[in-house]
Amino acid sequence: IVAGWSAYPRQLDFVRFREIADKVGAYLFVDMAHFAGLVATGLHPSPVPHAHVVTSTTHKTLAGPRGGIILSNDAEIAKKLNSAVFPGQQGGPLEHVIAGKAVAFKIAASAEFKERQQRTLAGSRILAQRLTQADVAAKGISVLTGGTDVHLVLVDLRHSELDGQQAEDLLAKVEITVNRNSVPFDPRPPMTTSGLRIGTPALATRGFSEEAFAEVAEIIAQTLIAGAEGNTGVLPELKARILELAAAHPLYPNLKKIGE
């Protein structure tokens, strides 16, 4: 039994998954790549005590270098995993990536990292709340499941004049990067879609406060409303507001320019 997700805005019940697996004599495999940072800080239930095998990336919400980890509490399974990975699947070690993972794991144990994850959750909830308000709903735009418990929001465009591709392109024009995403019972083709997936970890990493997240949420809402109305004349002003936010939250605030 496989549990995990890449576009689901709620928590999973790993206890129940394990009960079902035990009942039918199955192994439980959980991929927590998307929400590992939340698990590390206690803001999301951990699958590790319940699953036979857990996998994760070391980037995404863990915010480390690109890579992966495989975990198991079962010694026999762990031995088989080790034998399967090396030498069959893995070659020479990349020491710089290993060092990057070590730094990421140390940071993940810090109070600063937990505060960042808390802002990540706060930001996604602020976004979900804004996108469920009446002016947005009037354009046929809603939020899947009505909210979020995690670091992302899945916008439902099935009843909107906008499709996922159009909405993605509109937001790109105001310098907001999101991705179109299929939603349950999606009537549109998979390369068009009727949804948007919007995540908040990158903004939290850049130091966005709840007030800044509220401004981003407002700009996203106004962009989607304008697109649904065919009123693209407001996009330059919305873009300017985003650029102002980005300038106030630089990627590397402590990085000095060469020559300084």
Curated annotation (Swiss-Prot):
Positions of the site: Plays an important role in substrate specificity?
H59
- Class of the enzyme per the UniProt entry, highest EC level: transferase
Task: Look up the EC number in the record and give it.
Answer: 2.1.2.1
Q: According to the UniProt entry, which residues carry N6-(pyridoxal phosphate)lysine?
A: K60
Name the Gene3D superfamilies on file. Aspartate Aminotransferase, domain 1, Type I PLP-dependent aspartate aminotransferase-like (Major domain)
Q: Which UniProt keywords apply?
A: Amino-acid biosynthesis, Cytoplasm, One-carbon metabolism, Pyridoxal phosphate, Transferase
One GO BP on record is:
glycine biosynthetic process from serine
User: Required co-factor?
Assistant: pyridoxal 5'-phosphate
Pfam families recorded: SHMT
* One of the record's GO cellular component terms: cytosol
- Catalytic reaction equation(s): (6R)-5,10-methylene-5,6,7,8-tetrahydrofolate + glycine + H2O = (6S)-5,6,7,8-tetrahydrofolate + L-serine
Q: In which pathway does it act?
A: One-carbon metabolism; tetrahydrofolate interconversion; Amino-acid biosynthesis; glycine biosynthesis; glycine from L-serine: step 1/1
- Please name every pair of cysteines joined by a disulfide bond in this record: none
Q: Name one GO molecular function term.
A: pyridoxal phosphate binding
**Subcellular location(s) of the protein:** Cytoplasm
Similarity section: Belongs to the SHMT family.
What does the annotation say about its assembly with partners? Homodimer.
Summarize the protein's role. Answer: Catalyzes the reversible interconversion of serine and glycine with tetrahydrofolate (THF) serving as the one-carbon carrier. This reaction serves as the major source of one-carbon groups required for the biosynthesis of purines, thymidylate, methionine, and other important biomolecules. Also exhibits THF-independent aldolase activity toward beta-hydroxyamino acids, producing glycine and aldehydes, via a retro-aldol mechanism.
Q: From the Swiss-Prot or TrEMBL record, give the protein name.
A: Serine hydroxymethyltransferase
Instruction: Report the source organism.
Output: Corynebacterium sp. (strain P-1)
